[in-house]
Amino acid sequence: GCGTGCNTVIGSRENRMYRYEPRQNDAVNSDWMCDAGRLDYKWIGRDDRLAKVRGPKGGTNWPSALKEISDHLAKADEGSVAIVASARQTNEELFLLSKLAKRFKALTDAVPRSGEADHLLVAEDRNPNTTGAQLTGITTKRVNSKLGAIAKGIASGKIKTLIVYGEDVTQHGIDAKLLGKLKILIVSDILPNATTRKADYLLPGCSH
């Protein structure tokens, strides 16, 4: 995806996705979409897609995991929580994370993605919702400006709880060794990565 925001139609059958197609919007993408966007769906049905909730002791269920997370956060001190969200999340998800961040005075940020623009359909910003992340206060005009501070906070022991949505933070300055210093790592994602493997609580995410 990218920041253009092409209007699309999803072709699916029996809970399996088969295609993206452009939906006409003359103000954004007319009748077109790029080939990369059209074909960017196969990961949704990957065999290794995350499907089961995991807690510190292994497999668990949603009610138990959410209660344990809630109980932990209820005891968290202000400034001891940080959130790394994704600029690929919806406005609604980002808004709720921003409310959680305000409750704990948490440091928050997102991960930037960029590529070459074609000045027609493909934007340089390869995140579809950087604007939403900025408007909700999750990140600033310079996306990733606070990731370094989050890493330093974990290293110093000030940040004890990290919440990660849809990103592999080990690729962005918060490595596995730092993650090991946390009291609790809460991760929601769709596909496995180095961050999901380190999670104390793993909550499978939704693609659409």
Give the ranges of each region predicted by the language model.
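Catalytic alpha/large subunits of respiratory electron-transfer oxidoreductases
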Residues: 1-208
